[in-house]
Design a protein with these regions (language model features):
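Extended beta-strand/beta-hairpin segments
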Residues: 1-41, 52-129
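Alpha-helical metal-binding/catalytic segments enriched in His/Glu/Asp
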Residues: 46-47
Length: 129
């Protein structure tokens, strides 16, 4: 804890450091990701990572260049993440219907998605270019 509602976390294996701030609507500076922002971002990152693993294992169209737009909606009483909306945007590619189904299934089975409380609404949209 660095004070002023800011934290620092270091990944020991890579020595990479991240910082968090409490959001402005909760007495923080909001200059960095909040802890709940990291949860929402972790969900999107996990989904795309699992799709990348599936692409490698199955030898199907790669997902390199895939991006995600993430929106987190907070609920009150108790304060918590109520909804995470993710739009996963795939780069141009010749994805078959079968590959699309495989990737969509992979996204929903990522460990972060399976670890979040069932009351947290996960809204996922897939955009195939």
């Amino acid at each position: 804890y660095l004070g002023e509602l800011r934290t620092e976390a270091t990944h020991l294996q890579s020595n990479t450091t991240i910082f968090t701030d409490a959001p402005k609507d909760n007495h923080g500076k909001g200059e960095m990701f909040s802890p709940t922002d990291l949860v929402a971002t972790a969900l999107a990152s996990c989904m795309i990572s699992i799709m990348g693993i599936v692409a490698m294992k199955e030898g199907i169209t790669k997902v390199d260049g895939t991006t995600a737009e993430v929106t987190k909606i907070m609920y009150a009483e108790p304060r918590r993440i109520g909804e995470i909306h993710i739009t996963i945007i795939f780069p141009q590619g010749n994805y078959t219907d079968k590959e699309k189904k495989i990737y969509e299934h992979a996204a929903y089975t990522c460990p972060v998605a399976k670890s979040l409380h069932p009351d947290l609404k996960q809204v996922i949209d897939f955009v195939w270019q």
